[in-house]
Amino acid sequence: MPTISQLIGSERKRLTRKTKSPALKSCPERRGVCTRVYTSTPKKPNSALRKVARVRLTSGFEVTAYIPGIGHNLQEHSVVLLRGGRVKDLPGVRYHIIRGTLDTAGVKDRRQSRSKYGAKAPKND
């Protein structure tokens, strides 16, 4: 605990918070180009082939981003929009690709949580 005299000499240092998504540079989303689209295996105890993409962002960073939903149309040179948000069982994956924007198609036949996967309302015939 500093004394009053010490506080007069120099003020308290402000604590700086470290961001969880530095590549976004304080923006809600960032555009980027896929450099590689591949699958990755999660940490123990989970088992799957998670779809991920390596993306070069307009901010100059190259990051790994998760492709949510079932099935996707992404390939190399696809232009995508990224948001923050990590995938707990994939180390190093701190971003999500936003479905239904730019070159990323929405999830087909999605009926619930449609807005999160860029799916249009189903036609009721």
From Swiss-Prot:
CDD domains: Ribosomal_S12. Pfam families: Ribosom_S12_S23 (PF00164). Keywords: Methylation, Ribonucleoprotein, Ribosomal protein, RNA-binding, rRNA-binding, tRNA-binding. One of its GO terms (molecular function) is structural constituent of ribosome. The keyword Repeat does not apply. Residues 1-28, 104-125 are annotated as: Disordered. It comes from the Bacteria. GO terms for cellular component: small ribosomal subunit. One of its GO terms (biological process) is translation. The modification 3-methylthioaspartic acid is found at residue 89. InterPro entries: NA-bd_OB-fold, Ribosomal_uS12, Ribosomal_uS12_bac. Belongs to the universal ribosomal protein uS12 family. Part of the 30S ribosomal subunit. Contacts proteins S8 and S17. May interact with IF1 in the 30S initiation complex. With S4 and S5 plays an important role in translational accuracy. This is Small ribosomal subunit protein uS12. It comes from Prochlorococcus marinus subsp. pastoris (strain CCMP1986 / NIES-2087 / MED4). The gene is rpsL.
